[in-house]
Amino acid sequence: MSTGTSTRVRTSLGELQGLRDGGVSAWLGVPYAQPPVDAQRFMPAAPVQAWHGVRDATQFGAACPQKVVGSMKSLGPALSEDCLTLNIWSPAADGKKRPVVVWVHGGAFLLGSARVYTGAHLAAQGDIVVVALNYRLGVLGFVNFGEALGDERIASNLGLRDQVLALRWVRDHIEAFGGDPGRVTLAGESAGSMSVSLLMHSQEARPLFHRAIMQSGALSLIHDRETSLQVAKLYLDHLGVKTLEQLQALPVESLQAAQEAVHRQLPQTIPSAPWYDGALLPASLTEARQAPTPPIPLLAGYNRDEIRFFELWRGVADVFLSRERMQAVLQRQHGDGFAAQVLAAYPESKYGLRRLGTHMSFAMPTLHFAQRHAAQHPTWFYRFDRGHPMLGAMHAIELFYLWDMKGLLPTMLRGGPLWGSRRALAQRLRRHWIRFVREGRPGDEWEPFDARRATLVFDQRDRMVDDPEGRQREVWGAQDSAPGMAGLGGA
């Protein structure tokens, strides 16, 4: 432990030298695992070993290997398999036990990096400790090579196991940074939110966090075991390998090329995604639905126009802007009768298709998860309506109100920093999130999600609305994991 505002911290692993960032202390690129490289590739990550001397923690670590696209290019992150690091922001490493929030980034389990999310202002405003983590992505983190090769050495869902290991690191070491290991909120957006929903069903992960925030995603993009095996065999065919050792010997570029080839073969899908493995996770979606969620407070919600973001993705947009292709997806997933009922609940217009796409992929899975949790445990639900002039309240837009994401603003928003009513909304949003992290409940004006399905709608003026998607929710019924993008192949 250090004193005052010193940025040198002593942990049981060794000393770390951080820096001052936005009035708080920050430690960047802190390893929580040994590098998963060479003979450790495709193996469960091992806890980081102790070091001698003072370790520099003033620079972000590398992002995990991925195809760097779009706005991520402006950040120019280094890519490396040695990427299992986390970033920490704290008002002070002074022995005070502050609430902790651990952030899991989104990116369809294929893209993203902890370095996109700067937690200094949240730490300063809320007197909390903010942790953002990296985890293995795509082919390196979410392909069922173990069963496909019949090799028990290869664990399932390596990317999720990385997240669990990071949570263990927080439990064991965050007190040295001014954090309370007994008050940890696990939070995420998109694939990060789906990760949170999965870890709420994991016996290994449950004891490691005490509150949960899910932004746009729950139990969707998740494969069953059969699908995960089919995907893994496609990878092995493309790579021409038959053993773990051959996989470990390949250049990472070859693995990334195989990922691109598999994705071309399975368009409009997320082939490299978590699966129900019966080990870290339940064995099936049915088992996950039937299992009780942990007795912790939950804050969850979605954005009104989620699918507008994906209209920028060629291929995905072709599905979500075609009523015929959406119908084919629904028929394949749920049968002709259910497909007809769902389609009848949405106008035959571009607006109707956008609502259907948003509900299918994000809103209904998140809403139904919240309903199930709220039956037993404290739950608060939101819909984010404040949108971009061109793209509406698209997927991920709320992140710009919560986080300091200056590196992405020029590309994503084109309008410069938050100002006026948008700045006021950002302050309200952060206040609710911070209070939830601190106390397990948001602001008093936010009514709990109950039988009325009370929902806080964030907009220029926030308002409580009962069951704002009532008609569509009733049509979707018990389908608490809508097809989402994982079910679009062949549409």
Regions found by a protein language model. Give the residues of each.
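C-terminal subdomain of alpha/beta-hydrolase-fold enzymes, centered on the catalytic histidine
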Residues: 197, 279-491
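Short loop/turn segments at secondary-structure transitions that flank enzyme active sites
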Residues: 33-34, 48, 57, 92, ...
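A broad, structural surface signal
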Residues: 165-168, 172-175, 193, 230-233, ...
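Non-catalytic accessory segments of hydrolases
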Residues: 1-157, 181, 266, 336, ...
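Substrate-access "cap/lid" subdomains that shape
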Residues: 172, 206, 211, 215-326, ...
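Serine-hydrolase-like catalytic core of hydrolytic proteins
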Residues: 73-244, 287-310
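Acidic/polar residues in short coil/turn loops that connect beta-strands
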Residues: 13, 162, 180, 276-277
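A structural signal for the main folded, soluble domain(s) of proteins
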Residues: 25, 61-76, 118, 124-125, ...
